[in-house]
Each structure stands twice: as C-alpha cells, then as structure tokens.
Amino acid sequence: YDPYPLEIIQQEHQVVFLHEHFHMVRRIFTDGRQAPENWWPTLGGFSVGHWEEDTLVVKTTHLSPENLVWHTGMPFSGAPDTYTVERYTFTDDRLMYTAEIFDPTYYEEPYVFSAGRVLAPDGMILEYECYPEYSGF
C-alpha cells in the first residue's frame, strides 16, 4: 500500500484520486458507465464505483500484469478475467482500505489485504522527484 500522500476529489460523476507517488491520477466513475471495448490494460485499470453509506466500493478491470507485483510483490496475471474490488471507508480521522484481488490464474480464492491512512485535511500533494542529495547517492 502506498505510503505517499493521496488527495481525494469527489465530483458529481466521478471520484478522482491524486497520488503524490509518480503523480498518478486515478478516476473512479460513479455514473454507471462501463469500460470501452477497446480499453487497454494499465497500472490503474478502469474503475467504476458506488457508495454504500460511508464506503466507496470500487471494481477495477483492465489491469496490466505489472500492477500488483509493483505494489506488493504478489503475482498478478492481468488476464481479461482478473479484477479487483476495493472498499474505502471514511471515519472521523482515518481512511480504511480493503482490496480483494480476483485472479483465477494464480488464486483459487480472492487475495485480500487491508490498510489504513490517517486523514490530514490540511495536507498537500508535493512534487514527486528523486533528488540525489536526498537519496544518499
């Protein structure tokens, strides 16, 4: 799970995640749309979501094979029948995260993991750069 700051912007038809790490932008469509037929696999995939009270439930398809390996080291096939279901639950001071990875190529049952973040309403996304003077090189 990414330790870098994350900004969440809720709009009428989507929720946008701005990740400091590699400046990644993730759009979670909440208007019922489905992935276009010609959508290609990417690290972020194609995400659709809906709200269940204070929990954003997100299903992501079209994930590239590098996705899970990059984050956790766990194998991930990226086959057309793979997908994730994530739950983001907001409390007074935390964002709780649970993900289920559905990949029949590698797992007989969904692979599940959870994590949490402390909410920092005044936090800011900063430039993500690798500076030699800060890396010890």
Specify the residue positions occupied by each region the protein language model found:
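PEST-like low-complexity, intrinsically disordered acidic/proline/serine-rich tracts
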Residues: Y1-F137
